[in-house]
Amino acid sequence: MGRMFGTDGVRGIANKELTADLAYKLGKAGAFILTEGTHRPKILVGMDTRISGDMLESALVAGILSVGAEAICVGVIPTPAIAYLTRKYNADAGVVISASHNPVEYNGIKFFNKNGYKLSDELEDNIQALIENNFKDVPVLTGENIGRKIEEDGEAIRDYIDFAKSTIKGDLKGLKVALDCANGASYITSVEAFKELGAEVHVINNKPDGININRNSGSTHPEDLIEYVVKNSCQIGLAFDGDADRCLAIDEKGNLINGDFILAICGKELKKQGRLKKNTIVVTVMSNLGLDIAMKKEEINTIKTKVGDRYVLEEMLRNDYAIGGEQSGHIIFSDYNTTGDGLVTALQLAHIVKESGKTFSELCSIMKELPQVLVNAKVPNDQKDIYLKDEEIKSEIDTITKNLDGSGRVLIRPSGTEPLVRVMLEGENQGEIDKLAHGLAKLIEKKVK
């Protein structure tokens, strides 16, 4: 069997790939591995608004209870809320049933350890090994040793809203905000937090029906929010994904503001407050070169990691950095939470807009995004490193890099799931880099034939 866990837990089409049987096994194995040696462990369970959530929750919880753990079910709640509340409630682990920004037919199961962090590869492998070994040496419990399910009555949502509000000083009175909840897990928390802080709140896509999560809405489809912000003269628009661990923004002119701009604006603000540890932000190799250029002007360092918020977080923890994230809107504020948190990000941005006295578009002028071109080159899986070995390809990359002369770059990334490498070029001239990227992709394809 291949590796069960992907970069963000176990994910697949619900009832076909991610079945109730698999959810039961994950609950049983996860509870056993994560709570070994604890007398009566507590595991927090939350989910997004997908129709398959109830089915998977029932199965997952059955697995948790079968090994003697208690399952505290908090219902529909954002992923970052589970990360935070696992710590706050001194739970032994947390689990979220969600497929984030994916369409409704997908679902996923993601574990957090007792400190609110995603699991290490090693722990995930231990969970998978236990399932594959058919739960060898796991005792069969009976009678009073079986765990209980505890239905939580709304306190968790209240605690998370209070926590999110506490991450800004002051209020948002006088700010006109539009929120797009993607018909997902943030449909209560984000709206309440902004209202309680005094903002004038306008909301779209906050009526989940089990099947409309992420449908033409949220951070993956911000078109409706863009139109809404402009039409209703809002000062800022904020779009969440299905489980609200990411956030993208819209300025008052209707421009989409991605995670690079959010990192630039928040990084500058943290520096101003003397809270930007080591004067550094953590980004991935896919962040726009324009962010590096902007941060250099602000005398802020950028550290680059592999793509994926787990790698950003690893780097932040290793060197105690305060902020990091991705273009997609996964932004991590290590002073506040242990994972990307859409609501915390949204509140920081809104607060900066209010306190600055500037328009959001003026704040975004901190950075000029360089044109970026991405071309896929088809390459057999066993030849994905050809760009590191072939002399002609290496020479072409060097020539392009030299010609871009510091105002652009070449980045080649092998796909982790498909037989291709991604050729990415950035530079000031869109036409020029488009031609160069396609030329380089063709050369790579020619060399593997």
Curated annotation (Swiss-Prot):
Activated by phosphorylation. It comes from the Bacteria. The keyword Isomerase applies. The active site is at S100 (phosphoserine intermediate). The modification Phosphoserine is found at S100. Mg(2+) binds at S100, D241, D243, D245. It catalyses: alpha-D-glucosamine 1-phosphate = D-glucosamine 6-phosphate. Keywords: Isomerase, Magnesium, Metal-binding, Phosphoprotein. It holds the Pfam family PGM_PMM_II. Transmembrane segments: none annotated. GO terms for molecular function: magnesium ion binding; phosphoglucosamine mutase activity; phosphomannomutase activity. The keyword Repeat does not apply. PROSITE patterns: PGM_PMM. Belongs to the phosphohexose mutase family. This is Phosphoglucosamine mutase. It comes from Clostridium botulinum (strain Loch Maree / Type A3).
